[in-house]
């Protein structure tokens, strides 16, 4: 296939840290690739967004130092395996900078995915706890958007549609 695979678990568990991302960057050094295909949840997606703007010699600190001038180095395709966060369509990655003692976002227009692919079948095997927390998150976002003082007819339409999709899933899981 001519592709390189990288499993986040090899580099640590939980939320992404600078140490984890730097280890992945070290692992990728010397490998030539044009695109990143991220299949996973929030940690995988956040790491992929960082990798898409990283040059071959970068460390996490380098990216934060030049955040205002980041450029896309690799095409980014995101396939989320959880529902509700919307991370596949945002341009922010939250990294716990353990070496600095802060948890802060890395934000750049260059971090938007080139494509986001939603595959409902990937959600069918979600453990109940993951489904529950991520779908509640999505439901809260939908209600929040609907009730916002800045809501408009279009945003309310999307909010209503989101709830129309989420609530039957709950009925299916719970009943």
Language model feature labels by segment:
Residues 1-59, 68, 172-175:
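N-terminal small/polar loop signature for handling phosphorylated ligands or for N-terminal nucleophile
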Residues 20-24, 29-32, 47, 135-138, ...:
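General structural feature for long, well-ordered alpha-helical segments within catalytic domains
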Residues 31-42, 86, 90-92, 133-134, ...:
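A broadly tuned preference for mixed-charge, low-complexity surface segments
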Residues 145-175:
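Active-site segments that bind and position negatively charged phosphate/pyrophosphate groups
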């Amino acid at each position: 296939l001519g592709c390189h695979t990288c499993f986040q678990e090899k580099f640590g568990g939980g939320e992404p840290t600078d140490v984890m991302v730097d280890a992945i960057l070290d692992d990728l050094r010397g490998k030539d690739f044009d695109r990143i295909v991220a299949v996973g949840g929030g940690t995988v997606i956040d790491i992929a967004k960082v990798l898409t703007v990283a040059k071959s010699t970068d460390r996490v600190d380098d990216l934060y130092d030049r955040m205002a001038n980041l450029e896309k180095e690799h095409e980014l395709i995101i396939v989320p395996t959880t529902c509700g966060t919307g991370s596949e369509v945002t341009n922010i990655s939250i990294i716990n900078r353990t070496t600095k003692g802060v948890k802060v976002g890395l934000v750049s227009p260059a971090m938007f995915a080139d494509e986001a692919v939603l595959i409902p079948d990937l959600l069918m095997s979600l453990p109940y706890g993951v489904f529950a927390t991520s779908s509640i998150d999505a439901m809260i976002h939908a209600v929040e958007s609907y009730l916002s003082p800045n809501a408009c007819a279009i945003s309310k339409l999307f909010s209503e549609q989101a709830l129309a999709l989420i609530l039957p899933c709950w009925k299916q899981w719970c009943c």
